[in-house]
Amino acid sequence: MESPIKFEEVDIATILKTLPHRYPFLLIDRVINIRADHSGIGVKNVTINEPAFQGHFPERPVYPGVLMIEGMAQTAGVIGITSVEGTEKPRAVYFLTIDKCKFRKPVMPGDIVEYHMRSIGRRKTMWWFHGDAKVNGATVAEADVGAMLTD
């Protein structure tokens, strides 16, 4: 029987080797609880130093929802790439779809966002994930995202 835990944690060094994204568009700090069922949790520490806060909004900073969706997609990409075994390991992830997206609560500087992602489908190199972004256990956003893993 396969163990439910495949990797316990992917740190920032591994994320940098896995994803092509860099500052200011690398939007996850680590991925924890990656499991054999292709689920895991991306972690983003939101600080006032985020470039988006310069214009969103200077008097009342709110972390942009679209950046949370990108954080979900990056988390899904790490989960997908780290789950592929052998020499066929993909080297790139392309974000393809966003469905059923909802923003529920604002995210502010000082919040720690957890992107709870789980695979809901796969066909060849295409993967689909459902994601719930949470702060202190409360859902702040949710979406289904699709991606293609490729060379």
Curated annotation (Swiss-Prot):
GO terms for cellular component: cytoplasm; membrane. GO terms for biological process: fatty acid biosynthetic process; lipid A biosynthetic process. The active site is at residue 56. The keyword Hydrolase does not apply. Keywords: Cytoplasm, Lipid A biosynthesis, Lipid biosynthesis, Lipid metabolism, Lyase. InterPro entries: FabA_FabZ, FabZ, HotDog_dom_sf. It is found in: Cytoplasm. Gene3D superfamilies: Hotdog Thioesterase. It is an enzyme of class 4 (lyase). Its main location: cytoplasm. It comes from the Bacteria. It catalyses: a (3R)-hydroxyacyl-[ACP] = a (2E)-enoyl-[ACP] + H2O. CDD domains: FabZ. Its EC number is 4.2.1.59. The keyword Cytoplasm applies. GO terms for molecular function: (3R)-hydroxyacyl-[acyl-carrier-protein] dehydratase activity. Involved in unsaturated fatty acids biosynthesis. Catalyzes the dehydration of short chain beta-hydroxyacyl-ACPs and long chain saturated and unsaturated beta-hydroxyacyl-ACPs. Belongs to the thioester dehydratase family. FabZ subfamily. NCBIfam families: fabZ (TIGR01750), PRK00006.1 (NF000582). This is 3-hydroxyacyl-[acyl-carrier-protein] dehydratase FabZ.
